[in-house]
Amino acid sequence: MLHKSILQVALKCSCIDMTDCLRQFLAFGAKASSWCRKHILWSVESIEESEEVQEEEHSRILPEIISMTLNISIKLLPSAAKCITVDMVHTIGDFISELLSLTESSMADKKIHGAGADIARAAPIFLDEAAKLCRVYSEAAKAEDCKMSIPDEDTTVKHSERGLASEVTRITSSTIQTLCKLGTYAASSGGSQVALLNVSWKGTVSLLQSGKGMIEEKVNVREIILTLLSLSIESMRVAAETWCTPLLETLGSSEARRAFLPIKFFLINAVRICSAYPSEAMAIYKNIIRCALAITSASILFSKKPQLKAANEALVELLEPTLFVLLDTLMKSSEVTPESKCQLARYFFENEEANGSDHMGQANREEINLPSLDCIFSMDSDVDLRNRALLPAELIVFLHFLNASPWLTEEVVIELSKKLQSLLNILTSEDIYSYVLGFEIPALYGADHSPAVVWQPVYTCLIQAMKTFMLSAVSSSAAWNELEAFLLENLFHPHFLCMEIVTELWCFFMRYAETETSINIVNQLFLLLKIVASPEGVLVPLSALRKVAHSVCIILSYASSATVDQVYTCMLNDENPSKSSVLHLALVMEGFPFDSLSGGIKELAVKKMFTSFAGYLESYSKNHRAINVPTSSWGVIGFPVHALASALQRCEIKDDSIIDEKSITTMFKFTISLINMYGTASDSVAHSVLVHFV
């Protein structure tokens, strides 16, 4: 009771100007704090029955004494911020240290904190004032350091300024450490310590920002970032475990947002610290990526449950932008070396590269289909990413970097271009390509001030990201060489999805590339077409020749008229006419875009086909309706028939003068003859001839 009475008097005196007696008040406050901490320890250890009455009285009065001590300190700190001398700062440092220890002990001890609502109100205010004091001292110390850089004859002053910086560093570092501990405690309190949570982490961030260049040796910045990441993942894990149990009702948007707001708070503070200390953040880039993968995996889990649609949309709206800003902070910083940025880009799919594409469909099949929450939300950055549960999330995060490629450095763009093959490799996994083809994911679109959540297929997101990356790669010759090699090597990828993606990229390239560039690329494709050309394969739909021709025709359908003209001219001017005919037929049968030819060349092409067909019919009539077998090894039976029939299906012919009545009559006679031959064929030779036409 005596201590309480003394503190009541001190609290009244603290309301007046204390400048002249500040040192005495600080010493008094430090002793009061020390006394309170000792009695907190005593109250925890006091368990004997004989002491129960005394303990009850003690537990009732002690919270009041602690609250008054904190309130006195709140009054003292603004005055202390005005007294910036080495001796005074040293005294204030001892005072702050005692008060921080008292605050930590009283907030963490349930026995004391549960009995004192006043402590819960006073502690955040004291911590906020302590953070303000540290910021003022940090600015003063930096200003004095600037003065020290100017030659001065007074060496005594120089010595005292160095002492000031040392004392400020001591106070600031101890304050940061206490704020982190209390912030972690408040995060685990189930939402009952919102004020303490806000003050603790905001104070931590502001002191790290203002103390940069002074506190790095005293404060483990990496550990603070890891703590925030861990809190984010743990909060997401709790929400996911709660929601992924069978739900009787659809989850509401407000409930989902309430669960995600603390996570956003942790991520925002992590972003601010990483922005101030990018080199420290880069040292733990694997943990940062792991956090991104965990939260993205949660989004993927939610997308599988219609009841969690609101949760998924809230996650994309509240968390995903901040999550990607956290990753972008490392890539944008000028303090991070290009090699470190490339190292981050190389991290994606590295386990899949180590195991090879054959591993994708073998081991861990159960883990792919039944991903565990424990695996997804593990904070161990060394967990083997061969666990398939994280691959869909890794794909989504990688697509973010492809979308961000316009502002990435050239070195990083080159590294990303080298990862495209690994991207295709993981798409061959059954569960990955089924996810790409069968799922929709939410994404933010629209103006910055009012973005809207739009659901779109994963495949669409994948294609858009790769197209964005193509546009970025053009500005770097090295990146474009990698990309061009990737497109050429995978144009005929054995997996249907990969081939579809690469073909789509080729079409995008042909649509927007300069004519000279597109002609050079198509010439390379045409050389490949010549390599696989054979008379045996031209009439076999799934032969190598027809597959290549099919891809070339799709690509040419998006090319300019000049490019299509170039390909057609190359076919006409080939040194081997018979081989040229085979190439011509393969392209025509796979849909060569005649309508994309310029006017004069298209007219010439159509006339040539009709002329060839008319000549074939004339020969057929002169031969007494016997089908000629070509003498050349490159000849194709009925070549003019196949060419014209295929062209007529896809080419719009407006000139009626090309076909006269006599030609039409001959066509019908030829068709009737083929039908009759098919019905009367008796030997293998006749049947083989008919197969070429049917």
Feature-to-residue mapping (PLM):
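HEAT-repeat alpha-solenoid elements in large eukaryotic scaffold proteins
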Residues: 2-10, 14, 28-50, 65-79, ...
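Short inter-helical turns and helix N-cap capping residues of alpha-solenoid HEAT/ARM repeat scaffolds
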Residues: 14, 18, 55, 62, ...
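Extended coiled-coil alpha-helical stalks
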Residues: 18, 30, 47-63, 78-89, ...
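Charged, low-complexity interaction regions
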Residues: 81-85, 111, 191, 216-219, ...
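Extended, charged low-complexity segments
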Residues: 226, 282, 286, 296, ...
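Solenoid-like repeat scaffolds
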Residues: 472-473, 489-494, 510-512, 527-531
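Cytosolic small-GTPase signaling regions in large eukaryotic proteins
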Residues: 514-521, 527, 531-592
